[in-house]
Amino acid sequence: MALMVKAEGGNGGKRWDDGFDYEGVTKIYVRGGLEGIQFIKFDYVKDGKTITGPIHGVSGRGLTQTFEINHLQKEYLLSIEGYYDISTGVIQSIQFKTNQQTSDMMGFNEGTKFSLRSMRGRIIGFHGFADKNLYSLRAYYIRIPATKSAMDGGQNTGRGYDHGGDYDGVRKVYVTFDGTSIRNMRVDYDKVGQVECYEYGVKIGTQNQFTINYPYECITSVGGSYADTQPYRCIVLRSLTFKTSNGRTSVFGKETGTTFLLESQGNAIVGFHGRVGSCVDSIGEYYAPFSPYPPPTEKLEGQGGDGGDSWDDGAFLNVKKVCIGQGQFGIVSVKFEYENDASEVVVGDEHGKATLLGYEEFELDYPSEYITSVEACQDKVMGAETGVLTMLRFKTNIRISPSFGLKAGFNFVLEKEGHKINGFHGKSSSMLHQIGIHVIPITE
C-alpha cells in the first residue's frame, strides 16, 4: 500500500496527480525560469517498462535539467529538498536524493527551505499543484523492507530472539554487564512515533544506557567481542560497541576473544536478533536505508535597538565568513557568507549602509570551526533615534574574533548551550540596530 507524504512548497495553482501505481521513478525533468521552477515531469517504471508522465506547469523561456535514476541497479528515490518564494508561492529550486547519489540543486537557492521525505520509504509517485509555475509537491511512497544479517557469537546455545525489522529506528539501548559477560539487553524502538521495548537476558550486573537522538541520528554499526566463557561453558558476548551517524560511540563490557563488526554502508540498524540464555550469546541486525533528519533550527530573539527595518538571512548548514562595515559611531552594515546543504556558497544580502571604508572580515576555518556566540554593544549615538550596535565580536569553538567597532553603552551575548550559529537576522537602517541568531544542535 502506498502512503502519502504531506505537501511541501507554496500555495496556489491547480491540482495534478500522477498516481502511485508504479515501481519507482526513473527520470526527472525540471525547467527553471526567472520566476522559479516552470514545470516538472517524471518518467516512471511499471512492469519493467518506462511510463512518461505529463508536464506539470508551463514551458517558457528557461533551462531544462534532468536527473536519471538507474532502477536496473536497484537505485530509488528517497527524498527531495528545495526552496520556495513565500510571497509568490512558486518553488525556486529543487534537489533529489537517491540511495546512491544526489542531484545538483536545480534553480535558485533563495526563499524558504522545504524537505520532502519519509522514514524508511522510497518515493514511487507524485502529485501537487502547478499553473504557469510549480507551486508544491506531494509524494507517494512505499516502505523499504529491512535486510537481516547473520549472527555473531554463539550460534546454537540459548533460545532465539528476533525483534524483526519493521521499526523506524532505535531510540535507546540498555546493556547490563557483570564484569565478564553481557547479561541483559533492552532496546527501545520507534514505530510511527510510538516507543516499543524488548528486553532479554538476566539482569545481573551494572546496567548502562545509550540514547540516540532519533530521528536526527541513527545507529550505523554494532561491533564487539565474544568468547567461550565459564561457568556457562558456551560462547557469549563479552563486549558491545554502538556507533551512530553523528560519529558518537558507546562501549559496553570488555573486549575479549573474537571481535566482530556488523554494518551496512548507507544503512541504519532498525532491529536486532540473536540468541540468549543466562547471557546474551549472539547478536545480529536488521538494516534499512535511513536518512536522518537535519537537526531542527531554532530562531533566537534579536537584541539591540528597535529602529530600522527587519531582515532575516534564514538558516544554513554553517557560517563561513562574517563581513563588518564600520562608521564613525558604530556598525553601519553587516554581510554574511554561508554554506547550504548542497555544499554551495551562499552570500547573504548587505544589511545597513555601504561604507567607503569597505568591510573587515572574519573568516572561519570551515568546516572544523563554527560560531558559538555573538557579543555586542548597544548605545544611543548622534543621528540615531533609537539604539544602535557599536561593537560586534564572535566566539567560535576554537577562538575569539577581534572586536569590530567601539565598546560603548551596554553589552549582551547571544548564544545557546550545546548549539552553533547557522544564520543571522536583525534590524538595520543606515546603521545596524539589532542582531539575532539561528542555531542548531552541535552534533560533531
Curated annotation (Swiss-Prot):
Say which domain of life the source belongs to: Eukaryota
Instruction: Tell me the keywords, alphabetical order.
Output: Acetylation, Lectin, Repeat
Taking every annotated instance into account, which residue ranges of this chain make up the domain Jacalin-type lectin? 2-143, 146-289, 297-441
Recall the GO molecular function terms of this protein's record: carbohydrate binding
- Name positions with the PTM N-acetylalanine: A2
Q: Which Pfam families match?
A: Jacalin (PF01419)
Q: Which family does it belong to?
A: Belongs to the jacalin lectin family.
- Name of the molecule in the record: Jacalin-related lectin 42
* Gene that encodes it: JAL42
